[in-house]
Swiss-Prot record:
The active site is at 410 (proton donor). This is Transketolase 2. Mg(2+) binds at residues 154, 184, 186. Its cofactor is Mg(2+); Ca(2+); Mn(2+); Co(2+). The keyword Calcium applies. Homodimer. Belongs to the transketolase family. PROSITE patterns: TRANSKETOLASE_1 (PS00801), TRANSKETOLASE_2 (PS00802). GO terms for biological process: pentose-phosphate shunt. The record marks 25, 259 as: Important for catalytic activity. Its EC number is 2.2.1.1. The keyword Kinase does not apply.
Amino acid sequence: MNRKHLANAIRALSMDGVQQANSGHPGAPMGMADIAEVLWRSHLNHNPANPEWADRDRFILSNGHGSMLIYSLLHLSGYELSIDDLKNFRQLHSKTPGHPEYGYAPGVETTTGPLGQGITNAVGMAMAEKALAAQFNKEGHDIVDHFTYTFMGDGCLMEGISHEACSLAGTLGLGKLIAFWDDNGISIDGEVEGWFSDDTPKRFEAYGWHVIPAVDGHDSDAINAAIEAAKADPRPTLICTKTIIGFGSPNKQGTHDCHGAPLGADEIKAAKAQLGWEHGAFEIPQEVYAEWDAKETGAAKEASWNEKFAAYEAAYPELAAEFTRRVNGDLPKEWEEKASAIIADLQANPANIASRKASQNALEAFGAMLPEFMGGSADLAPSNLTMWSGSKSLEANDFSGNYIHYGVREFGMTAIMNGIALHGGFVPYGATFLMFMEYARNAMRMAALMKVQNIQVYTHDSIGLGEDGPTHQPVEQIASLRLTPNMSTWRPCDQVESAVAWKLAIERKDGPSALIFSRQNLAQQERDAKQLANIAKGGYILKDCEGQPELILIATGSEVELAIEAAAQLTAEGKAVRVVSMPSTDAFDKQDEAYREAVLPSAVTKRIAIEAGIADFWYKYVGFGGKIIGMTTFGESAPADELFKMFGFTTENVVNTAKELLA
């Protein structure tokens, strides 16, 4: 059957889906349909019956607004995505949301839509493939051997994150990464030459990529030849495909009119006539389905891989078991027992150290049990303390390590980590100063939205970093992380809480964790076994009084020590004071009402929250009748001790505030 006719099935479904929803983006799917047909029918190794097959090729639609393209491909190829699902495009609770979302339609590898993040996720997936291959493949046993393909448009390339990711991809020689640039010259505002005149091929050549320029995106033979050349090259490849947006639409193709709006019934009729597509809305002939159906070939490809893995398992049984454990996302059998023993040992052996150092110690203790760790930092390893004795850096010619030097690329790092997590086989952690999570915020939000494991180490957590001043001193960042749905945020007060935070982040498979650590040393707190167990609940009674407290001090991180000192002084003056350490408000909020009431009795309304971050967040816990010792402005450049005094983080101020409240 004519390849163009098979590609027209994508065009027809895309036009019909957008028209039915009365919103969407038909232009990109219609423009990239020929490329998609060649890639999916002649090159992509996948099995519609098992979208989780470990050695499948990955396909990422970075220009996610063109979502009807991937939905059409999945439907036509035989995934569990029905024609009714396509008719429900952009409708409530459908499997076909406006932008592709991970966890809805089987075969969607990542959530895309915020431009540039899809190509960056793809870089992460390609890194994971190369690292897994280096760690597990043996001579004659290539059990990890797949490509990562991504489609991207002009918008992805305009976004700065594409520079961060593609630069690193070239440096690390990700030869299994193949990107298709949809060079159609059109964006929402019109012809892009007025705001995007880069020499994109030269840009990617400068990154160290293999660039295939000037490929006719509507010539199947040229597309096929480009893919073959890309697969044969040891470098990442950019295939520059010149396309016509809205291809087939006689009155709108090549213009921004078909970018982000339905074509309209009359134009769809005219387009189908021009394309020679003689079928009604959402009608696909059986002979077209037969040509597209990948179930039989996909099952055969996976069966062939299963035979390869069986041979590998016979030759390397321990490695095979470890590979299976890691791609399934399971922790080692001895994890719980050993990790809990490490935490108990820390409590029994006090140390007054910075929580960033406590974090490094936790990595040292836990890392030996977790070969799936894939660490990194945005050029701050000596400050974030993210390297441990078992860390080995990834290099272009040696990917057997477990540590990525991301360079100064916070946004790229975080979205790459999403790709690594989505690929499977690794537990990724990255790091920067808490202030610079602002560069990476949207990628962390995407991790929360997708419910993927992404552990971020954010150090230098307050005005406590001192002389670098307000450009580097976070104020509102902790609160913003706490306000992000499905984000788990921890700000520990000592080495014990730090280790607990790490343990829980490692165990959490349904979302990201932000671990927030100090630059300055923190005193270790005394705890009994019950208090030690209650750290995991996010908030617990660290110091109590006889009977009902008349005042509760709630603190996190470096301010817990301050609360303990103030409570001791107030207790000596006859006040009944309770101190609650609350390293994770989201973990505390998940506890049952009885536990929360036991820690923060509703009858005790005199409460003070103490945190060197934005004050307003804490009204949820202290009520309007309570007091908050926090930040209401940006910081200053000065030694940390002077800043804490200036902003009221002193025992004297806590005591005086308490007395005012109790008066």
